[in-house]
């Protein structure tokens, strides 16, 4: 049994570097073959020759019949079977141990090279000229050989050597030869003994005088052992076939895919290098859009907010509300009488008339805001002052009726007339509105129609009034009247106009 233990230790080392099916096969070999053969079979087959008897007294006839019945003992036959079947596994184990030893040597040499390399780095300038430099050169020639050998088996994360290359081929040959040995020993057992032992064996080999009967001890027990060992051999054969399928197809496909994957990085490295070189070319395009987005949207927003109110009066038709008129502060523009045709339009009015470009989001008109209570109260207070002024104008009209009508056609000094009112709100400067028709008024004595020059003045003032009254829903119509030159006190008129803070003059009437 000492020899069996030595074989068991060797097979245990091989089990560490085997597949799952290979480990199962080794377990079957250990338990159902070696242990059973060493524990029970020798005792059962121990009296094989001593208890073999024949019914003859002829010397030598019994030995000749035993040799014919059992050309080789079953115990020895099974021992040979175990040895032959285990031999391919032992060869594979030897290959693994060789690889392990080569790896250990490689590591030792690499450590030596690292130590020598560190020493050469410290005294590199003198090492190139000294004799030790040649030795260092030889050391530098070793790493390429070692790098080539590192491509052979490599240990996995569990510390086992991976099957690949020559090691994988060795393992496949190991399985194939084990299968062949199993089949050969099963067939040999069938031809040598068969699968059953009969209690009586007839022998007619000389020197026996005639056919003699020989008797075998414990034939039934021996038959059971034969069948048991045959079943174990069949199980081992089945495991070998499964392992051939597992390695012959799966592992070979893995080897092909692994070789293909090892070759692919070499081909894929060139596109990676190309993309790496093209990165500086592709980086500049994203920069210009960033500059455009930061500068473009900033000026658009204030323009839309400033221009949006311009569209409000355009979307709706002009209308006149019957609300109290609003007074205007005095302005410094020239009177209408000093111009033959029409007063000059201020520069800011021309700016309002010119169309201003509006961006796309401004096309939607905004609703006209309703007047607030503060604005309504303001105009109510102004209406009271205007009513007092109208009373004064009525008195002036009565006095004008008493004067001769010829004086009405006299030219009035330009200083009496008020210039064009100054615009209060910036919206009035920007909104050009359609001119209203000429307005006529009838006095108590005579009716006067507005001249062409005054009509143009009314057109301008009508536009200004519409632009002024549109957002607050209130209009103010001004009628020009002529005063008598002698009956009206200019001081009184100027004081009244200043106290009421209105734009009306002695020759104007607000209706």
From Swiss-Prot:
Organ and tissue specificity: Detected in eye lens.
GO terms for MF: gap junction channel activity; gap junction hemi-channel activity
Keyword tags: Cell junction, Cell membrane, Disulfide bond, Gap junction, Membrane, Transmembrane, Transmembrane helix
Residues in the Cytoplasmic compartment per record: 16-19, 93-174, 245-511
Main location as per UniProt: membrane
Region entry Disordered, spans: 110-143, 397-511
Stretches with biased composition (Low complexity): 403-415, 440-456
Residues that span the membrane, as ranges: 20-40, 72-92, 175-195, 224-244
Composition skew (Basic and acidic residues), residue ranges: 110-119
Superkingdom per UniProt: Eukaryota
Single biological process term from Gene Ontology: cell-cell signaling
Membrane topology of the entry: Multi-pass membrane protein
SUPFAM superfamilies xrefs: Connexin43
Annotated Gene Ontology cellular component terms: connexin complex; plasma membrane
Extracellular compartment segments: 41-71, 196-223
Bias type Gly residues, positions: 129-138
Disulphide-bridged cysteine pairs: 54-214, 61-208, 65-203
Intramembrane region positions: 2-15
Subunit comment: A hemichannel or connexon is composed of a hexamer of connexins. A functional gap junction is formed by the apposition of two hemichannels. During early stages of lens development, interacts with the C-terminus of MIP.
Purpose: Structural component of lens fiber gap junctions. Gap junctions are dodecameric channels that connect the cytoplasm of adjoining cells. They are formed by the docking of two hexameric hemichannels, one from each cell membrane. Small molecules and ions diffuse from one cell to a neighboring cell via the central pore.
Family indicated by similarity: Belongs to the connexin family.
Listed name of the protein: Gap junction alpha-3 protein
Organism: Gallus gallus
